[in-house]
Structures are given as structure tokens and as C-alpha cells.
Amino acid sequence: MPFITVGQENSTSIDLYYEDHGAGQPVVLIHGFPLSGHSWERQSAALLDAGYRVITYDRRGFGQSSQPTTGYDYDTFAADLNTVLETLDLQDAVLVGFSMGTGEVARYVSSYGTARIAKVAFLASLEPFLLKTDDNPDGAAPKEFFDGIVAAVKADRYAFYTGFFNDFYNLDENLGTRISEEAVRNSWNTAASGGFFAAAAAPTTWYTDFRADIPRIDVPALILHGTGDRTLPIENTARVFHKALPSAEYVEVEGAPHGLLWTHAEEVNTALLAFLAK
């Protein structure tokens, strides 16, 4: 299987599993918590059919990548992404992040610039700043909320995932119509196969402050979000994000949950392909 080495922990290398398919302009898809690059299958199929080269990779700690106990912060995640881009020598690439993966996109552009990048897309994003503070009243929640998530993951991450996916996909509305029990089970299995340390460390990165990164986005951008998102509510994320980046193309998918890559794949793919074609 293909791997890219991004670091070292004690006697073992830290290797990221990746897939590289198709030809044409490269599109790099960066997954969300607690999934893997395979969560993009409905977008990958559409992009390949449209003539793009599609690269997915599993973030450290998730999927088939190494499961280290170090490097769970967005500076390191962005450095990992930079290593992927440099190793594959990608040029004129499009970065597409989903949920937690949008953080890599923002921090990469801020830290490494856009010499290799043509466009960026933020799907169900966590920008600009989830933490509710005195100087950020639009934040989603106080730090105690995120501490509670970490505690729940440490207590029984497998039970946590079951509840997490209920709201991730809005199963009370979409199970049996827009998503099957089998697809939900696959998400749970993917989550369970990830590292225990990564599962607990990831939520501490969600309240990273990206407000200083956003002004450095100097390529065409797409912000797309579901109005029914219970995981990252649109009023705390995309709508505020768009005000900070008014040049971005902005799309709201009516009624879509956080996990809209699967439940509203047609709407997502239509908007993404239209953005790429411009």
C-alpha cells in the first residue's frame, strides 16, 4: 500500500496512507473526524468521471495511517499536508477540506502560501473560531463543552461514536432515505479503527483560532455548508466565515446535516464541480 512518511515517534516512522487516481488537475480531499480518505467515495467518483486526478489521504491517527501519540495540532497537520504535496510534486492543485479537514486547508495556505494551489474549498467547515470567548461571541461553545467531548471519548469512544453519528447524519430525519444503516455502520467501523489517542486529541484542535489565517487565502474559495448541520451549526461557522472571506463563493445546502458528503452527495458534487470548472 502507498504511504508517505511525515515524521518519527521513537523507533517507528509516522506514515500517511494515501490514494492517487486519475489524471488531470489534481484535487486533494482532506477528510473529517473520525473518518478516513474513503469517506470521499461519492465525491471521488464524480471527480474522476469529470476528468480530475483525485488524491485522498488519511490524517495521522486515522484510517490506515500510523497512530502516533504526537502531532495533533494544525501546524503539524498542515506540515503533513505540505509533505504530501511536495512528495507527489503537485502543482495547480485544488485543496478540498471537509469539517476538521478544512483546518488543514486554512492553516496550509496561511503557512505555506499558494504557489502549488489553484483553488480551495471548505465543506461543512469549522472556521473561523469555534470557541466562544469574550472577543468571539459568535463561537459555538465554551471550552468546557469540548472538554466534555474529550472526557466522553476517553470513557468509551465506541459508545461516543454511536451518538456522534446520530447528529452527524441527522439520522432521525435521514436514516432509510438519504443514508442506510449499512453506511452508518461503515462510518462507525472506520471511526473505531482509528487510534485511541487521536480520537481524544482531535477535539482539542477543533477550537483552533483560524481568524488570522483567513485573510491569507488569496485564491478562489468555496464555502459550502448544510443548514441542518447539528455538529458545526452554520450560524457559528459558514455564515461568519463568509463575512470574513466575502470573496468566496458561498453555498448553503438546505436541510443538509454535517455528513452531507454522503446524504447530499448530488448537491455537494454539483456545487463542487461547478466551482472547479470556473
UniProtKB/Swiss-Prot annotation:
EC number(s) reported in the record: 1.11.1.-
Domain of life: Bacteria
Pfam families named among the record's database cross-references: Abhydrolase_1
SUPFAM superfamilies xref list: alpha/beta-Hydrolases
AB hydrolase-1 domain residues: 26-264
Class of enzymatic activity (EC top level): oxidoreductase
Active-site residues, record numbering mapped to chain: S99, D229, H258
Molecular function in Gene Ontology: chloride peroxidase activity
Keywords annotated in UniProt: Chloride, Oxidoreductase, Peroxidase
Keyword DNA-binding belongs to the record: no
Keyword Oxidoreductase attributed: yes
Subunit relationships: Homodimer.
PANTHER family: HYDROLASE, ALPHA/BETA FOLD FAMILY PROTEIN (PTHR43433), NON-HEME CHLOROPEROXIDASE-RELATED (PTHR43433:SF4)
Family statement drawn from the similarity comment of this UniProt entry: Belongs to the AB hydrolase superfamily. Bacterial non-heme haloperoxidase / perhydrolase family.
Protein name according to UniProt: Non-heme chloroperoxidase
Source species of the chain: Kitasatospora aureofaciens
